[in-house]
Every structure is written in C-alpha cells, then in structure tokens.
Amino acid sequence: MASAGTQHYSIGLRQKNSFKQSGPSGTVPATPPEKPSEGRVWPQAHQQVKPIWKLEKKQVETLSAGLGPGLLGVPPQPAYFFCPSTLCSSGTTAVIAGHSSSCYLHSLPDLFNSTLLYRRSSYRQKPYQQLESFCLRSSPSEKSPFSLPQKSLPVSLTANKATSSMVFSMAQPMASSSTEPYLCLAAAGENPSGKSLASAISGKIPSPLSSSYKPMLNNNSFMWPNSTPVPLLQTTQGLKPVSPPKIQPVSWHHSGGTGDCAPQPVDHKVPKSIGTVPADASAHIALSTASSHDTSTTSVASSWYNRNNLAMRAEPLSCALDDSSDSQDPTKEIRFTEAVRKLTARGFEKMPRQGCQLEQSSFLNPSFQWNVLNRSRRWKPPAVNQQFPQEDAGSVRRVLPGASDTLGLDNTVFCTKRISIHLLASHASGLNHNPACESVIDSSAFGEGKAPGPPFPQTLGIANVATRLSSIQLGQSEKERPEEARELDSSDRDISSATDLQPDQAETEDTEEELVDGLEDCCSRDENEEEEGDSECSSLSAVSPSESVAMISRSCMEILTKPLSNHEKVVRPALIYSLFPNVPPTIYFGTRDERVEKLPWEQRKLLRWKMSTVTPNIVKQTIGRSHFKISKRNDDWLGCWGHHMKSPSFRSIREHQKLNHFPGSFQIGRKDRLWRNLSRMQSRFGKKEFSFFPQSFILPQDAKLLRKAWESSSRQKWIVKPPASARGIGIQVIHKWSQLPKRRPLLVQRYLHKPYLISGSKFDLRIYVYVTSYDPLRIYLFSDGLVRFASCKYSPSMKSLGNKFMHLTNYSVNKKNAEYQANADEMACQGHKWALKALWNYLSQKGVNSDAIWEKIKDVVVKTIISSEPYVTSLLKMYVRRPYSCHELFGFDIMLDENLKPWVLEVNISPSLHSSSPLDISIKGQMIRDLLNLAGFVLPNAEDIISSPSSCSSSTTSLPTSPGDKCRMAPEHVTAQKMKKAYYLTQKIPDQDFYASVLDVLTPDDVRILVEMEDEFSRRGQFERIFPSHISSRYLRFFEQPRYFNILTTQWEQKYHGNKLKGVDLLRSWCYKGFHMGVVSDSAPVWSLPTSLLTISKDDVILNAFSKSETSKLGKQSSCEVSLLLSEDGTTPKSKKTQAGLSPYPQKPSSSKDSEDTSKEPSLSTQTLPVIKCSGQTSRLSASSTFQSISDSLLAVSP
C-alpha cells in the first residue's frame, strides 16, 4: 500500500456470521457494463455501512520492478474500484493507486473524503496469501481536487478519539486467470437495520476504466487466504503532485503469546498526538491535534482464522500527514507495518484460540508480559542485504514494481509470532501510558530485478503461521540509543496492575531512560573489544529510543515453540535465599518459560540496570524478566554489561554495583599480552606445563627472533594477526617473508598445520569461562559451547593459503560463504556450527575419550587465568572498592590438533552473545541466565545508595546487610585475621600438612569467604567450578604470590568435596551466630598463633602473640594450655605438645645463599617466623621482647 511500502488490505467483519453467499465460491456475479453517473453513485455509497471487501482472485501475483508488460506477454489492464466511506464500520476509507502507462487519473471527486481508490495490474498468478490492511479516510476539511504525483500517492487518514470500530481478519476465495486482468472489490454487510447492502462504484476515471466491468458485492466467505500481496504500482507520468492531507495512523495490538491479533478495548484512551514522519519520503506524518468529531476510525487487523467469528476491537489513534516538499520524492514510501507497530499503546486483550480463553488479568502483570515478550525472541537491528540460509525456500519475496531504490531488503523477515509489540514511551509523566512520541521512519524500496519467490507453504493453520512481511529500514530522529534499553523501561509501565497503581505511578514519575554514557566515556578503546562488532548490540544505536523493533531473522520461525500460557508457566520467587542464616539473598533470573514474582515496591524500585550500547539483547531479555528498569542516574544501578574500562575508571563503581569486567583483564584479552604472559609462565615453569599456546612473535620488537625461526623452517606456515582485532579482521596465512606486513604492530604465530579434521574441515571450540572473583580465585566453565567449522574442506597446499573459508573458523568470516550451512538442532552434528555436547557425542562414537579432552581444557583454562592473576589482583586492590563489584565472562578459542591436544588460540574479554540461530539462542540464553544467577546480585540498602560510600548504615526495612560489613568487628579480631594470613604466607616451602591446618581455626573472614563460595556453588546452574577444586592444590605454585584465601578455599575443597553437607552445616552454625559479620562477644575465642611456635619448654607456658595486655591475661591462667583457638566444631581444641624448638613446618637453616635466593622471591615469601628456644641456650629473641616482636613480624608481612 502507498503508506506502508508493503502489501496490506483492510477487511471488515461482523461479530456474527451473517454473510450470505451470493454465488459459487470463487466467482463474481456479472454486472451490466453501464457506468453510473457521479451524482447517483456517491449518495448511494454513503448509505452503505459495515460491508465486507472481497478480493475475487484465486491467484494474484506481483510484477518485478524490472519487468514490463511486454516481457510477461500479458498486457496490463488495471481496474479502479471506488468504495464508499461506509465500507468500514467507522466510515473508514483508503486510497490505493497503481501505475500503468496507459491510464491516468484526471479528477476524483471527493476522493479523500469518502472513497477508496483501488488499482491493480495482474501479470502472473500467485496463490493467495495472508491479507492484512487498513482503511483510510480524511477529515472533511481536506476536500480538494486530487491528482496523483508521479511516483507516490499521498494517503490520508484521520480518526476520532471517541469512535471505535470492529475490525476482523478474514479470508476470501480468489479467482483469476490471465484473461481476467482486473481485481474485483466487493462489499457485503449489514446496516443498522439489518438490511443487505449493494455496492456502488463510480467516478470520473480515464477511458481504460470505462469498461464493462463493474465490481459487485460478494457475500461468499467460504475460504480464508493467508495473504494476498497487492503492491503499489507507481505512476510514472501524467500525474500532478498534490499536497498530502492530514491523516491519522492506526493501532495494531499483538497479544505476544500466540501471534493472535488482539486490538485494544473500546474504552482505551488514545494519545492526543502521535506522529510518524518518514524521512525524505513521499508523504510526511506529523503530530496532529485533530479533535473534530467528524472523523473516522482507523483500524487494522491481522488475518487469522477465528473459528468462532469472535470480534476484535481496535483503538482509534490520531495523526496527520504534513505537507512537505519531500512528498514528491518518487522513491520513498511510508512503511505501514512499522508505523502501526510503533504506535501501539498499552493494554493487551488476549483473544481465545482453540477454545481456550486467557484471562486479561494475566497481561496486566508486567512479569508475565516480559516472559511473553522475551520468550523465543531475538531482536534484530535493521539489516540491509541480509542473507539467510539457502534452505529457507518458503519465503515470500514481494517486489514493488517501479521501485528505483534497490536496498535489497526483500530477504529480511518481520516475524510477529509470539512477539509482543507495544509502544515505547519516551515521556513518562502522569498516569497516561501512551505519551506522545515522535519518530522518523526511513522508508526504502525493494531491489530491482527480484523475482517473486515460491509460495508460502500452508501446512500449518493460519493461526500458527507467523506473518511474514518485508523488512523495515529505520531512520534516526534523536540521539542514538539501544532500542531494547527503552523496551526494558516501557515494559512495566505499559502494562500495570490495578493493585500496584501507586508504585507504578511512582515509577512513571521517575523517568527511566538510558543512562548518559558515563562508563563508556572512559572505555579503553585500544583494549580488546573482542567480537563486539559481531554482536547485535553494537548496532543497536541505529535505532531511535522511541522505536521498538521486532525484527528477527527467518530462523526464528523455526525455533518459536508453542508458548506457555500464564497458568502453565513455572512461577519462581524473585530472590534466591542463601544456604546460610544472616546472609542476604540474591536476585533470581529466570528463563522464558518462567514467571518471576514481583518484589514489594520498596525493594523493586532498587532494581536498576545501566544500559550500554554494547549490552547484548540476550542480557536485556534476561534482566527484563526479573523486572529491572533502566536507570537514568549513574549511582543507583545494580548491574551493567558494557565496554571494558581503563583501570582508574573502576573507582567510580560503588560497592553495590557490578560491572562485567575486571581491571587488567586485557592482559589475556589482547593477543600480544596473552603471549607475553604465557611465555613468562613457560620460562618459569617449563614447557611441560605451559606448551598449549603456539609459538608467537610480536612485531616489531621480535623481528630478529622471528627471522631466525623463519629461516630454520622453510615450509612452515605462519598466521598473522593484529594484536587487538576480532572476528577474523586482518588475519592472514602466509609462508613467504615478503608477504609479512611492515611497519605496524602484529602478532606472528606458528600455524597449526595439522589440525584434527571432521569431514575434511578444521574447526575450533568456543569455550565460555566465567570468573566471579580473583582473590580468592573462582573460575567456572560452562558445560556447553560452540564448535565452529571452516566452510571449505582443509588442504595443506600452499596455494590455498589465501582462502579464508578454509583456514579461518570465525563465524563472521564463514557466514559470508555461499556454502555455509546453519544448524538449527543443538544435538545434531550437521552444518558448520555444532554444540559442544554434540561434538563430545560424535567423538565418543569414534572411540575417543572426550572426558580426557575436557580435563585438558580445564587445565589450560586455569593456567591461562592464573597468568593474568598478579596484574588483575593488584589493580583490584588499587582501584576497586569491593571485590563484589567485578565479574567477567571470557570466550576461549581452542583448537584440537591431530592428537586431540587443546591449543589456546586467543581469549576474548567480550565474547559475542549474538544469537543468530536456534543453536545460539539455546546455548547462550541458558549460559547468560546461569551466569547472572551465579553472579549473585544483592539488593542494597536504600540508604546506602543515597549515602556516601564510606558510611556504614543499616535499615530495618531493607534486606540484611552484606556479610562483608565489618563495622561491628572489634580491633583485636581484625588483628587476629591479619596475623593468621601472614602466618600462612610467610613460609618459603610449605607442605600439604601445613596448609591443611588452615582449617583448624576459622576467622570471621574465613567463614565469610567460604560462605560466599558455597552459596555461589549452589547457584552454578550448568556451570562447573574448576578452581578451586579438590585437585587445584597443584596450581598454587603457579601463582606469582601465594594468596591466603586460595589456600583456604583449596583446602576446604579437598576436605569437604566428598561431603558438602557436613561443610555447609559447619558454616551454618557460625553464620547463625553472626560470626561471619564480625559479631564476636568478649567471651568468644579468637585465633592465635599455634602453640608449637611459642612454647617455653621449662614451664610449658604458651605465649599469646596478640599484645602485652593479652600476655597479662594469659599470666593469670592456671592452666598451661590456654590458647584461645577457635576449632571447626566451635570448641577449644587441645594444644599440640611438641618439643621445644620444633616447628610444625619444615625449616631451613639460615645462610647467605638462602638470603640471595629469597631476595628474588616476592616480598611476602622472604621472611620466616622466629623460633623461641628457652632451655638455657641463647634465644633468638629474648623473653621480654617475644610478644611484641612476633606480632610486629607477622603484621609487617600481612597483606
């Protein structure tokens, strides 16, 4: 249609099935060829009300833009049909015009006031398809002589807010032949008195219309077609441009759950002004305040089969076409589909399907709305020349004849099945959920020479087939911001429950828009932004904030499973409660088949998320299901998924906030830094432990070393990579020195020329690694991943080195290959992308031990993360207020050689979460949901958000405070914790038995860290923790500096990995007392130095090393075994009696050689504790200075 750029029609239907069949199905009663006079026809037309339009053609086909009438062999015979204004229940009319070189419109009396001009040229046959349209009518003030512009037709449409209409989707039989080159437009229905009406069609038209054909009414409602595309045939000559009259757009509501169309109730309020302005288009729609009562209702309905002939009510909206010089642009058109989608307002009324009625109240719940909105949905930005798998042959490619702009948008699909489309409000004042919004739609024509595709298969019922429309290119009218950021904001405001009115009102008053790019302003652009360009989130800025785009690729049609109704969804609590008492719960993130309950308003208002331009859609959908809102401020948000920042910028993150990056993680995220760190570890610990990374050289500094290695292996292939690139950009495979790029930083790496092949193709693995903490280090590995194949079979020949489809496995590269095959089944071993679990099944069938490969992958992942640990940990202590504030997802690219040895190729700090296939959605969707649950987002105290970060406050109305709150901890307990850490970090060569004693005494910090670890483990989902583990003690030697909490967690795992319940019960007993929060009474025992260290053999008096005041207390004790130790079961253990001078850990005699050796070690490992000997020999320390000296010695090395 002229206003939409795609094929649309309007079909009116009464609620009762009262239409009579006037003749055989598919036929039109013959009418006399007389031409009624204008004066007789128009008054007669106004007497008709609520008829049905009939398109009597079984097969209708469009004409390619590049083809003329002579090429098809059938001369065009256009037919014009004038339908009275009463054809629609609200007096709605439309104007549709085509193009023909032999036909001209000279005068159309009162066209925009009362009639529908319809013109159709049929050259070929095409099975009927889905029929969707709307009715157009202008206000009486716009009566003027009308003539068509050269290649565009202004469309007028106005609506009265006080009027509503009953609009239905229906299907009609269509008959056509090559000798019947006209389209019959009929109407049937009832007037208020119930009488059947006849059609009256007339007007002043050119001679080609003065034929014997006169369309008549046809009451036959036997068949219901899916779609009938009727494109706008553009006039090329003889037509004079005219200023477009004022119109009003239509409102189209989707239920979102089943694809059924459900317009709004009659009593729904209409915004006073909503405008849609096509930039540089043939007609402009601007804001209108039309309040004239003499207006008509505009309605739209999607064609779907309604067995019960149930009515749907469409709401009226107001809009106006604005006069513009751009209206003469012959290459632009108004896109109807996008206009009605953008202007849809709140309120969903679920229509029954298959005899099931869904209560409207379910849609008043924003949580349910979000589940419906996000279930099985992938948001796609506007795409140009987007290619889809070749096997999708069922698409309908509609071409607009005469189109001159060839943007090639015919392959993109607008999917409406199970998609909730609603208005994104950009103004949130008051309780009106339909604020005025103004946006621009940049319309584009289809490409020339595109032949219509095969007909749409009709194997499913019409109610189950998603509407397939042409793609829409959106323009920008304001600052570029992500579309789904605004959708998160509008989801809860568009649909609200009456019982939650006051909270929602408060939310509306608090304008929740996307934040100003505060974090992104300080992003390190030269750091690794791996695969951000491959993600759909990087292109979200192409959409203005008031536009909610429901564009997804055709593959979504294959993965849209039957949605669960509200009562079928699993209801989940909003919070995950801890395993331990006095520990705050974490926010729950659900799947698309779950409905997350709402928190009370006082807590729900704290759910704020900072949106970034690179926040993936799949993250937005997941947080939206948990009722997060977009924060406008920089201090009240809880989470952000954005760019990596420079390290000093992490100071701006407050204690209750989480960012998805660690400072310094680019140490493994950049290819050059990764090689430097791994080569350093290799030189320190040997190639046996660190030989999983191909030999690399960093140019220009390693040019001489590269030249030497190059000459030693003449037949060696080398792969050249930019140090901070992604998606295969700039990667080359070379074998000649002359092919090496000069004068720019590069990483030159030995090419793995003998990879493991499957069906002759090489592949790599995308492994998802999640780090929740660096101190203590906690690493998780997602159980599934992706297997990415090269799209050409591998050949070791030197002649094939330039073929990227053979040597590179990046999806961004291989998707451009015409031979690339997608895979829709996550368990199938087909196509060029598999699930990781499918690979393990494949290898198991080949007799390969996949478990052994998985264990090797775990090993290389842990070692790679440890190589970055010293940098990240030091930056965390320097710039991050609280370890809670950072977490990060890494994407490891691993390749298997012919011996199935895993090799780390690179590490991505921002792995692509773009979901372009059912396989991607299944794996990445589950992974993100489990990741966010594992992250443990905690609701802060409302006072903490407002108050200064350094203040320590509590609230009786908020959730329990963080376990890390040390405001109530006494100074002696803080001192004891530091001394214990120093005690276990000052040993040069500790053994396993010595480290095992760390669990004999638990401090408040110990309990807090172990509680966090066990709570986190219980939320792991499909993640597997690979560090710490019961075998991770072997990795402790790889740390540049020993970390006390790594020792603690590793020993805990070794002791309790086989009996988790026992360890959890022990921690629960201490949490019940509040010990993990530093709540220790005066009588509670605290940690002290082991008795074997400070035992005086003469009197067996155990000296406590806290302070002199503690010494006086010990002197008053009558017992010689009075060490204030806290054992695992909460009792005071018996001290271990050892000989004087013996230590529970191995000691080396002091020597100058030892001093030289230890001077090279980290500072924390250079000191040894003094040993006291009081058996008459000379003591290393005198008794009078023992206590203070030991205390100073320990605290001096305490981290």
From Swiss-Prot:
Positions with a binding annotation for Mg(2+) 2: 906, 908
GO cellular component term, pick one: ciliary basal body
Gene Ontology MF annotations: ATP binding; metal ion binding; protein-glutamic acid ligase activity; protein-glutamic acid ligase activity, initiating; tubulin binding; tubulin-glutamic acid ligase activity
Binding site for L-glutamate: 788, 811-812, 833, 924
Spans annotated as Disordered: 1-43, 472-517, 525-544, 1130-1199
Main location: cytoplasm
Binding locations of Mg(2+) 1: 893, 906
Subcellular location: Cytoplasm; Cell projection, Cilium; Cytoplasm, Cytoskeleton, Cilium basal body
Compositionally biased region (Polar residues): 1-25, 1130-1141, 1164-1192
Keyword Cytoplasm: yes
Cofactor requirements of the protein: Mg(2+)
UniProt site (Essential for specifying initiation versus elongation step of the polyglutamylase activity): 727
UniProt GO BP: microtubule cytoskeleton organization; peptidyl-glutamic acid modification; protein polyglutamylation; regulation of blastocyst development
A Pfam family matched in the record: TTL
Family indicated by similarity: Belongs to the tubulin--tyrosine ligase family.
Protein name: Tubulin monoglutamylase TTLL4
Organism: Homo sapiens
Lineage: Eukaryota, Metazoa, Chordata, Craniata, Vertebrata
